[in-house]
Amino acid sequence: MRTLYPEVTPFEHGILCVDDNHRLYYEQCGNPHGKPVVILHGGPGSGCNDKMRRFHDPDKYRIVLFDQRGAGRSTPHANLTNNTTWDLVADIEKLRVALGITRWQVFGGSWGSTLALAYAQTHPEQTTELVLRGIFMLRRWELEWFYQEGASHLFPDAWDRYIAVIPPVERHDLISAFHRRLTSEDEATRLAAAQAWSLWEGATSCLYMDQDFIASHENPHFALAFARIENHYFVNGGFFEVENQLLRDAQRIANIPGVIVHGRYDVVCPLQNAWDLHKVWPKASLKITPGAGHSAFEPQNIDALVCATDSFV
């Protein structure tokens, strides 16, 4: 079974100003003359971490990572102004041009898969391959499954902690109830809601619970960006024209090679998502990992993703 490549240090990092407000942190790792790949983190709002550098062979790939608007080391932190899917798609292009890259592989999981599909469908000529994990397409049923009722029946203990910050009278629409608190003028209200929202996803992302991983979701800096930006996208339907837009426009990536990796026991983003995508994008190979959940860092998901990136060099 394949594991992550060894730790790697960026050979370059910087800040890209994408408008009058947003400044995005980016970094490059691996071989400056290697095959380019851009890594798209999840959330939206989670930001990149050092382990995300390690799915690609650093001797063969030029690995580009960046923190999306409001996330991680990008500023202003947790900001929702001009923060939409299509702003992020445009940011990816601005970064590609700024780095002098003609075409690149696009790698992303969870929300990163959403953004990767949106980017590739908008800029297929700049996309050499897609490597996707934990498919998420922001359809209404997906949001209701995880944030209203569905996953709640599998993790009732974590669910009770998630809904504790919302009065019973508001629990018929939890995404909206959290939105009111995450955009509150009161800092304590925002933080309490952000930590509850963030911990819910942390508690459900792995087949076998990882307490350190769960605890990381309670960090105030992480939780505020993660929860505020995620919720902002969800109340706006991902800023898509129609909820099945990524499936509707799949013909735009029909000729792009791809690999879809999805955990059989992914509770956050059910396997149905990958199945639906594969049916309209048969050129991609679908790898269902039989002993994994949602997290990219579960052993079987790591194995499948590293095998996928190796196959393209």
UniProtKB/Swiss-Prot annotation:
<feature type="domain" description="AB hydrolase-1">
    <location>
        <begin position="35"/>
        <end position="298"/>
    </location>
</feature>
<keyword id="KW-0963">Cytoplasm</keyword>
<keyword id="KW-0031">Aminopeptidase</keyword>
<dbReference type="GO" id="GO:0005737">
    <property type="term" value="C:cytoplasm"/>
</dbReference>
<dbReference type="InterPro" id="IPR000073">
    <property type="entry name" value="AB_hydrolase_1"/>
</dbReference>
<dbReference type="InterPro" id="IPR005944">
    <property type="entry name" value="Pro_iminopeptidase"/>
</dbReference>
<feature type="active site" description="Proton donor">
    <location>
        <position position="294"/>
    </location>
</feature>
<dbReference type="InterPro" id="IPR002410">
    <property type="entry name" value="Peptidase_S33"/>
</dbReference>
<dbReference type="Pfam" id="PF00561">
    <property type="entry name" value="Abhydrolase_1"/>
</dbReference>
<dbReference type="GO" id="GO:0006508">
    <property type="term" value="P:proteolysis"/>
</dbReference>
<keyword id="KW-0378">Hydrolase</keyword>
<dbReference type="GO" id="GO:0004177">
    <property type="term" value="F:aminopeptidase activity"/>
</dbReference>
<dbReference type="InterPro" id="IPR029058">
    <property type="entry name" value="AB_hydrolase_fold"/>
</dbReference>
<comment type="similarity">
    <text>Belongs to the peptidase S33 family.</text>
</comment>
<feature type="active site">
    <location>
        <position position="266"/>
    </location>
</feature>
<protein>
    <recommendedName>
        <fullName>Proline iminopeptidase</fullName>
        <ecNumber>3.4.11.5</ecNumber>
    </recommendedName>
</protein>
<keyword id="KW-0645">Protease</keyword>
<comment type="function">
    <text>Specifically catalyzes the removal of N-terminal proline residues from peptides.</text>
</comment>
<feature type="active site" description="Nucleophile">
    <location>
        <position position="110"/>
    </location>
</feature>
